[in-house]
Amino acid sequence: MTAILPSTAATVNTGFLHFDCVGKTFPTPRGPYVAIEDVNLSVQQGEFICVIGHSGCGKSTLLNLVSGFSQPTSGGVYLDGQPIQEPGPDRMVVFQNYSLLPWKSARDNIALAVKAARPHLSTSEQRQVVDHHLELVGLTEAQHKRPDQLSGGMKQRVAIARALSIRPEVLILDEPFGALDAITKEELQEELLNIWEEARPTVLMITHDIDEALFLADRVVMMTNGPAATIGEVLEIPFDRPREREAVVEDPRYAQLRTEALDFLYRRFAHDDD
């Protein structure tokens, strides 16, 4: 039987990244809007977490709280025991829209981040870091091209390399492959896992794609609908690492997990039509 845990099962205080009774309310002309409430989750160091749910379920709110772009109305978000109060280089975000400087080459986009976040390195060491991360994402030959000369998949490779080059403790991925075609998407998912296996940052990834979540994650956090969204269930993903897509998809547990996620999202927490 696949392990499905209620959100309270993840509320131990030993997590590297910890959400403690987190709520977030936004003021609106119609009165306060409760985006999320009573969110409890502990993420271990080096763990890969995917968060899925319908639009408006608070996924982006969680991302902004971990990033430090926003503060909770109630409760707290903690990294290594310290409250997250502002953005910092220990947490890097990769967005769906690439967020690259258009006038700089792929190499210079990465180099700028390394120089800003790791000034203690010598020029030679910084250059080696950039070279290494360009090689990791397969862009050594395209390193001098600007973003407008790169495909969508290549742009996202640059964004991932830039984020990882500064050695963040937490990598935050906001639907990074959502705008890509199916083939490129699968290629980048596999590349992401290979890169993650090397550096092992803690990953919090927002996605709408159940198959993507099941392939990548150690646990899949499923959100209830908003307003007042919270964690409904947490799927434990049992597949061994390193993972091969064919082996994962052919595992009988994969179909069971997928069915359970679909049941949660499209039957128990389906959006009303009216």
UniProtKB/Swiss-Prot annotation:
GO biological process, one term: nitrate assimilation
Protein name (Swiss-Prot/TrEMBL): Nitrate import ATP-binding protein NrtD
Keyword annotations: ATP-binding, Cell inner membrane, Cell membrane, Ion transport, Membrane, Nitrate assimilation, Nucleotide-binding, Translocase, Transport
Free-text disruption phenotype from the record: Mutant requires high concentration of nitrate for growth. It grows normally with nitrite or ammonium as the nitrogen source.
ABC transporter domain location: 17-250
Subunit field text: The complex is composed of two ATP-binding proteins (NrtC and NrtD), two transmembrane proteins (NrtB) and a solute-binding protein (NrtA).
Bilayer topology annotation: Peripheral membrane protein
Catalytic activity reported: nitrate(out) + ATP + H2O = nitrate(in) + ADP + phosphate + H(+)
Subcellular location: Cell inner membrane
MF term (GO), any: ATP hydrolysis activity
Record function comment: Part of the ABC transporter complex NrtABCD involved in nitrate uptake. The complex is probably also involved in nitrite transport. Probably responsible for energy coupling to the transport system.
EC number: 7.3.2.4
